[in-house]
Amino acid sequence: MTKMTTEEAFIKVLQEHGIEHAFGIIGSAFMPISDLFPKAGITFWDVAHETNGGLFADGYTRATGKMSMVIAQNGPGITGLVTPIKTAYWNHTPLLVVTPQAANKTMGQGGFQEVEPVSYTHLTLPTKRIV
């Protein structure tokens, strides 16, 4: 079995699911993963606001039939995805939403820009928190 980092495993799963485009805003919590995008053949489209990234991802998937993903920063970035998530839901568009979060041992302690992302995305199913 080949050893790989968590970031490499995440990228491998994206590749296995045919993700070639990601839209959103990259911050420090997501940089180790985004650094692997070019080698993995994933094009990242930087946007000025997470809402735009979510709408771009929805539009890309509807126009091409290929799934993409949106990346949002924790806190305000997550709340900015409410409209795109609901738009994708009503358009029956698969939308992969990826957001960073506080470390498990510090969750719920009111850390910098901490929100519980699953509570904002309960508008649709399924929603998963991956530790």
Task: Give residue spans per PLM region.
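N-terminal alpha/beta PP-like core and its mobile active-site loop of ThDP/TPP-dependent enzymes
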Residues: 1-123, 129
